[in-house]
Amino acid sequence: MTDADGVLREYPEDGGSSLREALSDILGAEAHFYRMTLKSKEYELFDFSMFVESEYGNAPEPVIPGVPEDALGEEILWRLMSATKKNPVSEEYELSLDAGVAIGDGRATAVYAETNDDGGINLTEIHFSTDDTGLITIIKSGEAETVMTFERGRRHRAVYHTPYMDFDMRLFAARVENTFTPGFGGEIHLDYALEIRGAAAHRTVMTMKFEPEEI
């Protein structure tokens, strides 16, 4: 559902209880429910028109002298991400939905579900340590699947699987902050660049807020 400002707002009013039951089945008896509000802003870093041929294949033309063009180096990413602060947002959305959270052995897993246009269910799992606030793994399953690792100041590879083709991606996280506290909720902040090899790159600034909602 989209509001008058073009901001996407979830969640379907019907079927909420059945989805909660499904999340409970996934997480087990220790699941606790939170109301999760996800806000995301996306900025375009570059598109295909900025690519040049090189010995490494298609790669973005270097914007910093002396930096090799085998891919976007971290120096280039920092420069491009800083420049987007002056650019208009290319995509913005907000979700509000139920998320189940289970905690054990110093690890936390948050799971939420979304319905797609065909009526199917897409699941997103967020895995993190309750001690290490600078590392988060997000697993998406359903019509499209991927495993994404966000580690502050580090670059990680990911593959985005779709029914049509797979996309090779690189993720570079400039900011990973996590204030989640069991029983009290909290917020997860991500600021990262996502490069789709041979296509484009975007910067995403995302906040996930968890508020306890026990039933």
Model-identified regions with their sequence ranges:
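Mixed-charge, glycine-accented linear interaction segment located at domain edges/termini
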Residues: 182-215
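Charged, amphipathic alpha-helical segments
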Residues: 15-23, 120-123, 136-143, 165-178
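Short, surface-exposed beta-strand/loop "edge" segments at domain boundaries and coil↔beta transitions
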Residues: 42-49, 115-125, 144-149, 168, ...
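Acidic, glycine-rich flexible loop segments
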Residues: 141-189
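Hydrophobic/aromatic beta-strand elements that line small-molecule binding cavities or substrate pockets
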Residues: 98-101, 125-128, 175, 190-194, ...
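Short, well-structured hydrophobic secondary-structure segments
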Residues: 57-73, 89-146
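Short, hydrophobic/aromatic-rich segments at coil-to-beta transitions
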Residues: 30-35, 70-76, 104-111, 134-137, ...
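Polar/acidic, low-complexity leader/linker segments enriched in S/T/G and N/D
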Residues: 1-61, 65-83
